[in-house]
Amino acid sequence: MEVHVIDHPLAAARLTALRDERTGNAAFRKALRELTLVLVYEATRAAPTESVAIRTPLAATTGLRLANPPLLVPVLRAGLGMVDEAHAALPEARVGFVGIARNEQTHQPVPYLESLPDDLSGLPVMVLDPMLATGGSMTFTVDLLLSRGATDITVLCVVAAPQGVAALEKAAPNARLFTVAIDDGLNEEAYIVPGLGDAGDRQFGPR
């Protein structure tokens, strides 16, 4: 599996804002949106393009556009904070949804929503989730995508734990992962350390 860790001072500054416990909900959402744009730019750096004929106010010329815009799949609820910015950068992308809660006793994923095309053959898929902790939610999501025929899967997250990276690689060895940081590991409650807390709660408030 390809693993790309974004090394850029602007990304690091926004990650610092996300980590800081003093950052409020609105500022957290803003920093997450800005980091999402960085992740999308990096993830599409080598995306296939096609030529398109256009006219400027002065002359005819040729430009580029993505040859095959992806399906964006935010993992709810934390991934909701990434989808608008990703869709703004990729306006022709389609959007699907996977909703997964976490059982706080077992730390296992509890799926509650799925809205995806039946056939994903030939369609690039970009999964959006700020956190890759145990990998339970992400492996459930990629297993679902693979079962629908997806072969081109890119995962965007802000912070990952080594355990989650390993779980994703086992589930989808041909996937690509783009993240801003790979942290030390997980605590006893299976939260990433140092991490940034519960990304859903920090965006939208406690459940």
From Swiss-Prot:
Keywords: Allosteric enzyme, Glycosyltransferase, GTP-binding, Magnesium, Nucleotide-binding, Transferase. The keyword Glycosyltransferase applies. CDD domains: PRTases_typeI. GO terms for molecular function: GTP binding; magnesium ion binding; uracil phosphoribosyltransferase activity. It catalyses: UMP + diphosphate = 5-phospho-alpha-D-ribose 1-diphosphate + uracil. Pathway: Pyrimidine metabolism; UMP biosynthesis via salvage pathway; UMP from uracil: step 1/1. Allosterically activated by GTP. It is an enzyme of class 2 (transferase). Uracil binds at I192, G197, D198, A199. GO terms for biological process: UMP salvage; uracil salvage. Binds 1 Mg(2+) ion per subunit. The magnesium is bound as Mg-PRPP. Its EC number is 2.4.2.9. Gene3D superfamilies: 3.40.50.2020. 5-phospho-alpha-D-ribose 1-diphosphate binds at R77, R102, D129, P130, M131, L132, A133, T134, G135, G136, S137, D198. Its cofactor is Mg(2+). Belongs to the UPRTase family. Catalyzes the conversion of uracil and 5-phospho-alpha-D-ribose 1-diphosphate (PRPP) to UMP and diphosphate. This is Uracil phosphoribosyltransferase. It comes from Mycobacterium marinum (strain ATCC BAA-535 / M). The gene is upp.
